[in-house]
Amino acid sequence: MLNLLQNLYTEEHSFKEAALDFTTKEGDILGSDKISGLEIRLSHVIIKDNKTAKIFPFPGLAKIYFLTLVVSDVENQIINLELKGFEKVDDGDALSIDKTIFYWKQTKKEKVPSQVHVMTSIIKSKQSLRDVAKIMENIKNDSDYKDLAGKLAEFIKDANQFSNITNLIGTVSSIVGKHLGKVEDKPFLTWYQSFTDIDGDWDKLGKTYKHAENKYAAMDLSITIRDKKRE
């Protein structure tokens, strides 16, 4: 059974701590309601070892699924699940992934996000890749997935439910696994990254880079914070 928590890299990024290297004058630390934009990008996804032997005449290429789950407390972006498939992936290959996975821009009435959780996972298939669009349709019609989405929508509104949110996101593996077909139980790499607004402070302006890597795969995340009044 697929377990996305195998080969797991996890980190909580506190913007209160990150703000320590941002020079400010006393009293000018602004609350989260003052930021004007936030973007999270995923890029540089590298397969270092595809765990497929090269035995003549077989070239040792792998078939891979790439799963992305983003959960936030933004009203119209509470949960976003995406799946992509990649054929004939060799050792050292870069997957064609360089995209924005979360974007928020200030409007007059919209609440600033206080937490964004990202889970990405690289999963090797043991059979021909299935139709990704059909898989996604089946997952979103799955009663367990609907129940999960409902609970996440409820918990994300309460900062005290942080651990429950983390646990719920982890359970997505059992839901996704039953729709992917025959895949390896252990992903190449799963990355769980939380970006949180601790004490209402998003004070690290500009771009912050994050990197996760093990012996099988590597990938990068970046988060960009904008504030027109401080730039």
PLM regions: where:
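N-terminal amphipathic/basic membrane-interacting segments and domains
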Residues: 1-231
